[in-house]
C-alpha cells in the first residue's frame, strides 16, 4: 500500500530557500511523509507530556497550551478569514475557524511584534529601567538532539541509561535524528515539531537560569524579568549590573546545552525602550493611516468603505513611496521590515474594502473611483514587493489578487479589465526587474518560492491574463536541458493545467518528473521523490499513462507487487490515488487555502 506504512530507519529532509533580505536567504526543510507519520504517532502518544514540558517556565511568551479541538463552529467572518491570516491556533480562537493548522493550540503572542505592542511590555518598561535583547547563535543548527533527554531528566542519568529506548526523550531524540539524515547535530528549520523540540529544551534552560540567579540573590519579578520568544531572549532589569548578571546566567545555562549567545547581536537600551526600528514603525503606521484616509471614506452608520475621488493617483503613489524610503534612509534592514509590514497592511485594506462592498449596488458614474482605489493599492503593493521580494509578501499578493479579481468580476465587471490588466502588467514588471535578475543569478541552482508564487499571482487573474510561452521559457529557463525542481514542476503544472498552448512546456515538465523518478529505490527515504510521486500521481493534468508508469516503477522499487500482477496492480493503485489529495491543491480556492497555511506556517 503506497499510502500506508512508509516507515524508514533514516529519512532525508529536502531543503528549499526563501529570501531573508537583499543579500541572504533562509534554508527551510520539508519533512519526508514517513517522518510526518511518525510525528503524528508521537504527538498522539506523548501529547500531554509535551504540553506539560512546555508549561514549566514563565519566561516563554509562545508555547503549546493544549490539544487543538477537532471541531469548529460556523464563523460569520469566514469570507474574510479565507484571505486573512490566522494560520496558527490560539487557545482563544481555535473554535472559530474551519481549517486547523496545528495539532496544538498556543498561548502567548503570535508574532514577536505583538509583544512589543502589548500592555505587558509597557508594564515592564514602567517597572524596569534597563532592557537587553539577546540572540542565540545559530540556534536550530546548533541544538544537539540528545539534549532533549537532558531537558526532562538529569544529564548524567541520560548518558548512563542510553539503552532506554522508549522514554519520551529517547523517542523524540530518535525522531529528530532520523528525519535529518540520522544527524544529531542540529534540527530541521521550518517544521512545527522542531519548534516544539526547541521549546522543551529552552523551558529547562529557563529554569536553570532562574536557579543560578536565585543563588546570586536575584529573584524573577523583583530584580529582573525575562521574556523569551523561541530563541530570542529579552531581559528587563533595574540596573546594568543586574542585567549583566542575568546575561552571564543565560550564557552559562546555554553552554550546558552546547548553545551560545551571539554577542554581536546583544542590544542594550535604557528607558524609554525605543529602538530605531520602533521609531520607524511608528512613523510608518502614521503614514499608512494618512494614506487610508486619503483613499477611503468610512460610513459609520452602515459600516461601509467608499473610495474617495483622487485628483492625482500617481502623486499619491510616488509621495507615499518616497515617504517610506526617507524614513528608512539610515537603515536598510528597516526598509525590509517596512516593506513586509506595508505589503500585509495594504493587502488587508484591499480585502476589507472588498468585503465591505461585496453586496452593494453602485451608480455607473462612481465606478471609476473603485478603479482609482485599486490602481493605487496595486501599484504600491507591487512596488514594495519588487524592491524587496519576500515569500510572505508573495503570499499576500496572491491573497490580494484573488480577492480583488473576484470582487471586480462580481461587483464592478465593467472595470475588471482595467484593474486586472494593471495587476498583470505589474507581474511582468517584476519578472523584468533587476531584483528578479539578481535572485535568478544569485541562486541559480534554486528557484526561490518568491518567484514561483508570482506565477500563481498572475494565474489568479484568469485565462485572459496568461504569460506567453516565450515569457515562461525565459523566466524559468524551461528550454534548457536541466531537470526542473520539485517546486517548479508543481507550480508550472498548476499554471499551465491542460491548456494546449503550453504543450511543449508540459512535455518538459513531464520529462523532468520522469527524470527525477527514474529510480525510486530510495523513495521511502528521499523526501523529494516521495513528494513528487504523490503530487504527480494525483495531479488531474497528467495523462493516466504517465501515472501508471510512475506507479508501476514505485511498486517494483518497493517490492509491493508481484511481477505477475504488476500491470493490474499499477492500474488499480493509479485509480485509487485519483481520489487522494496530497499537499498541492489543483484548483484556485484550494490553492489559496494552501498558500495561507504555508505562509511560513506561523507556529511562532
What are these regions (language model features)?
Residues 1-6, 10:
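Single conserved hydrophobic/aromatic residue that forms the stacking wall/gate
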Residues 28-131:
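Active-site-proximal segment of RNA-dependent polymerases
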Residues 39, 43, 148, 247-251:
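Short amphipathic C-terminal alpha-helix that caps PH/PH-like domains
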Residues 48, 214-218, 259:
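Short aromatic/hydrophobic-glycine micro-motifs
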Residues 48-72, 155-164, 281-287, 292-295:
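Internal, charge-rich low-complexity segments
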Residues 123-230, 235-244, 297-532, 536-604:
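Conserved polymerase palm-domain catalytic core
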Residues 240-319:
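Polymerase palm active-site segment centered on the conserved acidic dipeptide of motif C
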